[in-house]
Protein backbone atom coordinates (compact mmCIF):
# COMPACT_ATOMS: atom_id res chain seq x y z
CA UNK A 1 0.00 0.00 0.00
CA UNK A 2 0.93 3.65 -0.39
CA UNK A 3 3.05 5.04 2.44
CA UNK A 4 3.23 8.83 2.45
CA UNK A 5 6.20 10.92 3.55
CA UNK A 6 3.86 13.93 3.59
CA UNK A 7 2.91 13.04 7.18
CA UNK A 8 4.94 15.87 8.68
CA UNK A 9 3.62 18.47 6.23
CA UNK A 10 0.53 20.60 6.69
CA UNK A 11 -1.25 22.71 4.10
CA UNK A 12 -1.91 26.17 5.52
CA UNK A 13 -3.86 27.48 2.54
CA UNK A 14 -4.95 25.83 -0.67
CA UNK A 15 -7.88 24.93 -2.90
CA UNK A 16 -8.83 21.91 -4.97
CA UNK A 17 -10.82 22.75 -8.12
CA UNK A 18 -12.90 19.94 -9.61
CA UNK A 19 -13.77 20.97 -13.17
CA UNK A 20 -16.43 19.27 -15.31
CA UNK A 21 -16.69 20.27 -18.98
CA UNK A 22 -19.85 19.63 -21.02
CA UNK A 23 -21.01 20.34 -24.56
CA UNK A 24 -24.59 21.65 -24.72
CA UNK A 25 -25.06 22.70 -28.34
CA UNK A 26 -23.62 23.96 -31.60
CA UNK A 27 -23.20 27.56 -30.38
CA UNK A 28 -24.36 29.92 -27.63
CA UNK A 29 -25.34 33.58 -28.00
CA UNK A 30 -23.36 35.00 -25.08
CA UNK A 31 -24.84 38.50 -25.36
CA UNK A 32 -28.35 37.09 -25.05
CA UNK A 33 -27.30 34.92 -22.10
CA UNK A 34 -25.70 37.97 -20.50
CA UNK A 35 -28.94 39.96 -20.79
CA UNK A 36 -30.97 37.06 -19.43
CA UNK A 37 -28.67 36.54 -16.43
CA UNK A 38 -28.54 40.28 -15.69
CA UNK A 39 -32.34 40.53 -15.74
CA UNK A 40 -32.81 37.49 -13.48
CA UNK A 41 -32.85 38.75 -9.88
CA UNK A 42 -34.10 35.58 -8.21
CA UNK A 43 -31.94 34.55 -5.20
CA UNK A 44 -29.69 31.56 -5.79
CA UNK A 45 -29.56 32.15 -9.53
CA UNK A 46 -26.49 32.78 -11.64
CA UNK A 47 -24.52 36.00 -11.19
CA UNK A 48 -21.48 37.51 -12.85
CA UNK A 49 -17.92 37.08 -11.66
CA UNK A 50 -14.68 38.86 -12.60
CA UNK A 51 -13.54 39.13 -16.19
CA UNK A 52 -10.84 37.05 -17.85
CA UNK A 53 -7.19 37.49 -16.73
CA UNK A 54 -5.36 40.42 -18.34
CA UNK A 55 -3.04 38.25 -20.43
CA UNK A 56 -5.97 36.44 -22.05
CA UNK A 57 -7.76 37.49 -25.19
CA UNK A 58 -10.90 35.44 -25.67
CA UNK A 59 -12.78 35.79 -28.95
CA UNK A 60 -15.48 36.22 -27.83
CA UNK A 61 -15.08 36.53 -24.06
CA UNK A 62 -16.80 33.61 -22.26
CA UNK A 63 -19.21 34.32 -19.42
CA UNK A 64 -17.87 33.48 -15.96
CA UNK A 65 -20.77 33.11 -13.55
CA UNK A 66 -21.33 32.06 -9.95
CA UNK A 67 -24.20 29.98 -8.62
CA UNK A 68 -25.19 29.23 -5.05
CA UNK A 69 -26.02 25.71 -3.96
CA UNK A 70 -25.50 23.16 -1.23
CA UNK A 71 -22.15 21.72 -0.16
CA UNK A 72 -21.10 18.23 -1.17
CA UNK A 73 -18.98 15.94 0.98
CA UNK A 74 -16.10 14.01 -0.56
CA UNK A 75 -14.36 12.04 2.16
CA UNK A 76 -13.32 14.49 4.86
CA UNK A 77 -13.61 17.48 2.54
CA UNK A 78 -16.60 19.73 1.89
CA UNK A 79 -17.17 21.68 -1.31
CA UNK A 80 -17.90 25.39 -1.24
CA UNK A 81 -21.62 26.22 -1.58
CA UNK A 82 -20.68 28.54 -4.47
CA UNK A 83 -20.18 26.86 -7.84
CA UNK A 84 -18.42 28.52 -10.77
CA UNK A 85 -19.98 28.26 -14.24
CA UNK A 86 -18.14 29.19 -17.46
CA UNK A 87 -20.09 29.49 -20.73
CA UNK A 88 -18.27 29.47 -24.11
CA UNK A 89 -19.75 30.63 -27.40
CA UNK A 90 -18.84 27.37 -29.19
CA UNK A 91 -21.28 25.40 -27.04
CA UNK A 92 -19.16 24.34 -24.07
CA UNK A 93 -19.90 24.84 -20.37
CA UNK A 94 -17.73 24.10 -17.34
CA UNK A 95 -18.94 23.51 -13.78
CA UNK A 96 -16.24 24.02 -11.13
CA UNK A 97 -16.45 22.91 -7.49
CA UNK A 98 -14.00 24.22 -4.89
CA UNK A 99 -12.68 22.31 -1.89
CA UNK A 100 -10.69 24.19 0.77
CA UNK A 101 -7.35 22.54 1.60
CA UNK A 102 -6.09 23.24 5.11
CA UNK A 103 -4.87 20.09 6.75
CA UNK A 104 -2.40 17.22 6.42
CA UNK A 105 -0.72 17.06 3.03
CA UNK A 106 -1.24 13.31 2.83
CA UNK A 107 -4.99 13.86 2.52
CA UNK A 108 -4.47 15.03 -1.07
CA UNK A 109 -3.99 11.47 -2.32
CA UNK A 110 -7.27 10.32 -0.78
CA UNK A 111 -9.09 13.37 -2.18
CA UNK A 112 -7.61 12.85 -5.64
CA UNK A 113 -8.62 9.20 -5.63
CA UNK A 114 -12.13 9.99 -4.34
CA UNK A 115 -12.69 12.65 -7.01
CA UNK A 116 -11.70 10.35 -9.87
CA UNK A 117 -14.94 9.70 -11.82
CA UNK A 118 -16.89 10.71 -8.71
CA UNK A 119 -20.51 9.74 -9.43
CA UNK A 120 -22.22 12.19 -7.02
CA UNK A 121 -20.30 15.13 -8.50
CA UNK A 122 -20.89 13.91 -12.05
CA UNK A 123 -24.61 13.62 -11.36
CA UNK A 124 -24.81 16.99 -9.59
CA UNK A 125 -22.82 18.80 -12.27
CA UNK A 126 -24.98 17.34 -15.06
CA UNK A 127 -28.08 18.42 -13.16
CA UNK A 128 -26.73 21.98 -13.03
CA UNK A 129 -26.00 21.87 -16.75
CA UNK A 130 -29.56 20.67 -17.46
CA UNK A 131 -30.94 23.55 -15.37
CA UNK A 132 -28.69 26.00 -17.21
CA UNK A 133 -29.87 24.71 -20.59
CA UNK A 134 -33.49 25.19 -19.51
CA UNK A 135 -32.70 28.76 -18.47
CA UNK A 136 -30.84 29.78 -21.65
CA UNK A 137 -32.47 27.36 -24.10
CA UNK A 138 -33.47 30.10 -26.54
CA UNK A 139 -29.85 31.34 -26.66
CA UNK A 140 -28.46 27.96 -27.78
CA UNK A 141 -28.31 26.89 -31.40
CA UNK A 142 -29.06 23.16 -31.79
CA UNK A 143 -29.30 22.56 -28.02
CA UNK A 144 -28.29 19.07 -26.92
CA UNK A 145 -26.34 17.95 -23.87
CA UNK A 146 -23.72 15.45 -24.97
CA UNK A 147 -23.12 12.24 -23.04
CA UNK A 148 -19.40 12.94 -22.89
CA UNK A 149 -17.93 14.85 -19.96
CA UNK A 150 -14.31 15.80 -19.39
CA UNK A 151 -13.36 16.18 -15.72
CA UNK A 152 -10.09 17.56 -14.35
CA UNK A 153 -8.65 18.33 -10.92
CA UNK A 154 -6.43 21.28 -10.03
CA UNK A 155 -4.76 21.33 -6.61
CA UNK A 156 -3.55 24.86 -5.86
CA UNK A 157 -1.23 25.04 -2.83
CA UNK A 158 -0.43 28.58 -1.65
CA UNK A 159 1.45 27.78 1.57
CA UNK A 160 2.49 24.83 3.72
CA UNK A 161 4.52 24.17 6.84
CA UNK A 162 7.10 23.51 8.11
CA UNK A 163 9.42 25.15 5.54
CA UNK A 164 11.45 22.69 3.48
CA UNK A 165 15.09 22.90 2.42
CA UNK A 166 14.18 21.82 -1.11
CA UNK A 167 10.92 22.59 -2.94
CA UNK A 168 8.35 19.82 -2.73
CA UNK A 169 8.20 19.50 -6.51
CA UNK A 170 11.82 18.34 -6.54
CA UNK A 171 12.06 16.46 -3.24
CA UNK A 172 8.67 14.71 -3.08
CA UNK A 173 8.09 13.54 -6.65
CA UNK A 174 6.90 10.08 -5.58
CA UNK A 175 4.18 11.47 -3.33
CA UNK A 176 3.14 14.06 -5.90
CA UNK A 177 2.86 11.34 -8.55
CA UNK A 178 0.32 9.57 -6.34
CA UNK A 179 -1.68 12.80 -6.06
CA UNK A 180 -1.51 13.44 -9.81
CA UNK A 181 -2.62 9.91 -10.69
CA UNK A 182 -5.15 9.56 -7.86
CA UNK A 183 -3.54 6.26 -6.99
CA UNK A 184 -2.56 4.89 -3.55
CA UNK A 185 -0.99 1.66 -4.73
CA UNK A 186 2.81 1.76 -5.20
CA UNK A 187 3.93 3.21 -8.53
CA UNK A 188 6.89 2.12 -10.64
CA UNK A 189 9.75 4.54 -11.20
CA UNK A 190 8.73 4.96 -14.84
CA UNK A 191 5.18 5.88 -13.79
CA UNK A 192 6.46 8.41 -11.26
CA UNK A 193 8.75 9.96 -13.84
CA UNK A 194 5.95 10.15 -16.40
CA UNK A 195 3.44 11.67 -13.95
CA UNK A 196 5.82 14.46 -12.90
CA UNK A 197 7.57 15.06 -16.24
CA UNK A 198 5.39 18.01 -17.33
CA UNK A 199 6.65 20.57 -14.83
CA UNK A 200 7.15 24.30 -15.25
CA UNK A 201 8.17 27.18 -12.97
CA UNK A 202 8.28 30.94 -13.39
CA UNK A 203 10.08 31.85 -10.16
CA UNK A 204 11.78 30.06 -7.30
CA UNK A 205 8.61 29.86 -5.20
CA UNK A 206 6.15 28.49 -7.74
CA UNK A 207 5.67 25.43 -9.92
CA UNK A 208 3.01 23.65 -11.94
CA UNK A 209 2.96 19.88 -12.40
CA UNK A 210 0.52 18.89 -15.15
CA UNK A 211 -0.81 15.38 -15.72
CA UNK A 212 -3.77 13.93 -17.63
CA UNK A 213 -5.97 13.41 -14.52
CA UNK A 214 -4.97 16.43 -12.45
CA UNK A 215 -2.45 19.20 -11.88
CA UNK A 216 -0.71 20.46 -8.75
CA UNK A 217 0.12 24.16 -8.54
CA UNK A 218 2.47 25.67 -5.96
CA UNK A 219 2.56 29.41 -5.37
CA UNK A 220 0.32 32.41 -4.92
CA UNK A 221 -1.82 34.08 -7.58
CA UNK A 222 -1.94 31.04 -9.86
CA UNK A 223 -5.37 31.86 -11.30
CA UNK A 224 -3.90 32.51 -14.76
CA UNK A 225 -2.34 29.05 -14.85
CA UNK A 226 -5.58 27.49 -13.65
CA UNK A 227 -7.52 29.30 -16.38
CA UNK A 228 -5.16 27.93 -19.05
CA UNK A 229 -5.60 24.38 -17.74
CA UNK A 230 -9.38 24.74 -17.60
CA UNK A 231 -9.50 25.91 -21.21
CA UNK A 232 -7.20 23.09 -22.34
CA UNK A 233 -9.61 20.65 -20.68
CA UNK A 234 -12.54 22.22 -22.56
CA UNK A 235 -10.56 22.05 -25.79
CA UNK A 236 -9.93 18.34 -25.18
CA UNK A 237 -13.67 17.74 -24.77
CA UNK A 238 -14.48 19.61 -27.98
CA UNK A 239 -11.76 17.77 -29.91
CA UNK A 240 -13.14 14.44 -28.70
CA UNK A 241 -16.67 15.48 -29.68
CA UNK A 242 -15.59 16.74 -33.09
CA UNK A 243 -13.53 13.63 -33.77
CA UNK A 244 -16.53 11.44 -32.97
CA UNK A 245 -18.82 13.57 -35.16
CA UNK A 246 -16.36 13.31 -38.04
CA UNK A 247 -16.24 9.52 -37.64
CA UNK A 248 -20.02 9.46 -38.04
CA UNK A 249 -19.83 11.86 -40.99
CA UNK A 250 -17.22 9.68 -42.70
CA UNK A 251 -19.37 6.57 -42.23
CA UNK A 252 -22.40 8.35 -43.67
CA UNK A 253 -20.34 9.83 -46.50
CA UNK A 254 -18.89 6.44 -47.41
CA UNK A 255 -22.36 4.88 -47.32
CA UNK A 256 -23.71 7.60 -49.62
CA UNK A 257 -20.72 7.28 -51.95
CA UNK A 258 -21.01 3.49 -52.28
CA UNK A 259 -24.81 3.41 -52.45
CA UNK A 260 -25.97 1.77 -55.70
CA UNK A 261 -27.53 4.49 -57.85
CA UNK A 262 -31.08 4.16 -59.08
CA UNK A 263 -31.69 3.39 -62.72
CA UNK A 264 -33.88 6.49 -62.96
CA UNK A 265 -32.85 8.75 -60.07
CA UNK A 266 -35.24 11.39 -58.84
CA UNK A 267 -34.30 14.98 -59.67
CA UNK A 268 -32.02 16.39 -56.97
CA UNK A 269 -31.41 13.05 -55.22
CA UNK A 270 -27.64 13.27 -55.76
CA UNK A 271 -27.60 16.94 -54.75
CA UNK A 272 -29.28 16.05 -51.45
CA UNK A 273 -26.47 13.67 -50.43
CA UNK A 274 -23.79 16.06 -51.65
CA UNK A 275 -25.30 19.00 -49.76
CA UNK A 276 -25.54 16.93 -46.57
CA UNK A 277 -21.88 15.89 -46.72
CA UNK A 278 -20.86 19.48 -47.49
CA UNK A 279 -22.79 20.67 -44.42
CA UNK A 280 -21.04 18.11 -42.20
CA UNK A 281 -17.68 19.21 -43.54
CA UNK A 282 -18.38 22.91 -43.02
CA UNK A 283 -19.75 22.32 -39.50
CA UNK A 284 -16.63 20.39 -38.53
CA UNK A 285 -14.25 22.96 -39.98
CA UNK A 286 -16.06 25.87 -38.33
CA UNK A 287 -16.13 24.23 -34.89
CA UNK A 288 -12.43 23.35 -35.17
CA UNK A 289 -11.53 26.95 -36.02
CA UNK A 290 -13.73 28.43 -33.29
CA UNK A 291 -12.31 26.21 -30.56
CA UNK A 292 -8.65 26.51 -31.56
CA UNK A 293 -8.85 30.30 -32.07
CA UNK A 294 -10.90 31.20 -28.98
CA UNK A 295 -7.96 31.75 -26.61
CA UNK A 296 -5.00 34.00 -27.36
CA UNK A 297 -2.24 34.55 -24.79
CA UNK A 298 -0.95 38.10 -25.03
CA UNK A 299 2.62 38.95 -24.08
CA UNK A 300 3.10 36.14 -21.58
CA UNK A 301 5.50 33.45 -22.73
CA UNK A 302 5.15 31.59 -19.43
CA UNK A 303 1.41 31.01 -19.91
CA UNK A 304 2.07 30.04 -23.52
CA UNK A 305 4.49 27.39 -22.26
CA UNK A 306 1.94 26.21 -19.70
CA UNK A 307 -0.56 25.78 -22.53
CA UNK A 308 1.98 23.84 -24.62
CA UNK A 309 2.64 21.50 -21.70
CA UNK A 310 -1.08 20.96 -21.14
CA UNK A 311 -1.54 20.34 -24.87
CA UNK A 312 1.28 17.81 -24.74
CA UNK A 313 -0.23 16.00 -21.75
CA UNK A 314 -3.73 15.99 -23.26
CA UNK A 315 -2.37 14.98 -26.71
CA UNK A 316 -4.19 17.92 -28.30
CA UNK A 317 -1.80 17.98 -31.25
CA UNK A 318 -2.65 14.36 -32.02
CA UNK A 319 -6.37 15.18 -31.82
CA UNK A 320 -5.83 18.19 -34.10
CA UNK A 321 -3.95 16.08 -36.65
CA UNK A 322 -6.66 13.40 -36.58
CA UNK A 323 -9.41 15.97 -37.08
CA UNK A 324 -7.62 17.72 -39.95
CA UNK A 325 -7.01 14.36 -41.62
CA UNK A 326 -10.68 13.42 -41.33
CA UNK A 327 -11.77 16.83 -42.64
CA UNK A 328 -9.54 16.27 -45.66
CA UNK A 329 -11.02 12.79 -46.16
CA UNK A 330 -14.53 14.22 -45.89
CA UNK A 331 -13.62 16.86 -48.47
CA UNK A 332 -12.34 14.10 -50.76
CA UNK A 333 -15.62 12.21 -50.38
CA UNK A 334 -17.53 15.41 -51.15
CA UNK A 335 -15.46 16.00 -54.28
CA UNK A 336 -16.09 12.44 -55.48
CA UNK A 337 -19.81 12.71 -54.81
CA UNK A 338 -19.95 16.09 -56.52
CA UNK A 339 -18.07 14.75 -59.55
CA UNK A 340 -20.35 11.71 -59.69
CA UNK A 341 -23.44 13.92 -59.53
CA UNK A 342 -22.04 16.10 -62.32
CA UNK A 343 -21.30 13.03 -64.43
CA UNK A 344 -24.82 11.74 -63.81
CA UNK A 345 -26.32 15.03 -64.93
CA UNK A 346 -24.17 15.03 -68.07
CA UNK A 347 -25.24 11.47 -68.87
CA UNK A 348 -28.90 12.41 -68.45
CA UNK A 349 -28.42 15.43 -70.72
CA UNK A 350 -26.70 13.25 -73.33
CA UNK A 351 -29.60 10.78 -73.27
CA UNK A 352 -32.09 13.63 -73.59
CA UNK A 353 -30.21 14.96 -76.62
CA UNK A 354 -30.09 11.48 -78.17
CA UNK A 355 -33.83 10.99 -77.62
CA UNK A 356 -34.61 14.42 -79.10
CA UNK A 357 -32.47 13.68 -82.16
CA UNK A 358 -34.14 10.28 -82.58
CA UNK A 359 -37.58 11.85 -82.29
CA UNK A 360 -36.73 14.56 -84.82
CA UNK A 361 -35.46 11.92 -87.28
CA UNK A 362 -38.51 9.73 -86.76
CA UNK A 363 -40.85 12.67 -87.25
CA UNK A 364 -39.22 13.47 -90.60
CA UNK A 365 -40.44 10.14 -92.00
CA UNK A 366 -44.06 10.97 -91.33
CA UNK A 367 -45.77 13.68 -93.37
CA UNK A 368 -47.35 16.28 -91.12
CA UNK A 369 -49.84 17.78 -93.61
CA UNK A 370 -52.98 16.43 -95.29
CA UNK A 371 -53.30 15.09 -98.89
Regions found by a protein language model. Give the residues of each.
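Short Lys/Arg-enriched alpha/beta "domain-start" segment
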Residues: 1-206
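Short secondary-structure boundary segments
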Residues: 34-58, 224-241, 357-367
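Short, surface-exposed, polar/charged, turn-prone segments marking secondary-structure boundaries
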Residues: 47-49, 122-126, 237-238, 244-248, ...
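Short, flexible coil/linker segments at or flanking structured domains
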Residues: 73, 81-83, 198, 203-205, ...
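Extended, charged amphipathic alpha-helical segments
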Residues: 170-269
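Membrane-associated alpha-helical segments
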Residues: 241-361, 367-368
Amino acid sequence: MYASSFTSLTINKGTCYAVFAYDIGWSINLEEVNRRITADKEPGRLRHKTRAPQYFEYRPVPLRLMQEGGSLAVGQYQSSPTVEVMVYDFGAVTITYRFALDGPFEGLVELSESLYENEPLLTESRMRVEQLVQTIHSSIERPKIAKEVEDYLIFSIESYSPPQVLPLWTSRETELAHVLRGERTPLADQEIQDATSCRISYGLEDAALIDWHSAVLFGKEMDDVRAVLEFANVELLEMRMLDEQLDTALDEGYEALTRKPRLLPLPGSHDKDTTYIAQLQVDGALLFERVTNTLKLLGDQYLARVYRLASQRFHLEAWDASILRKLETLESIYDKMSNRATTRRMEVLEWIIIVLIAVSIAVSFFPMGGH
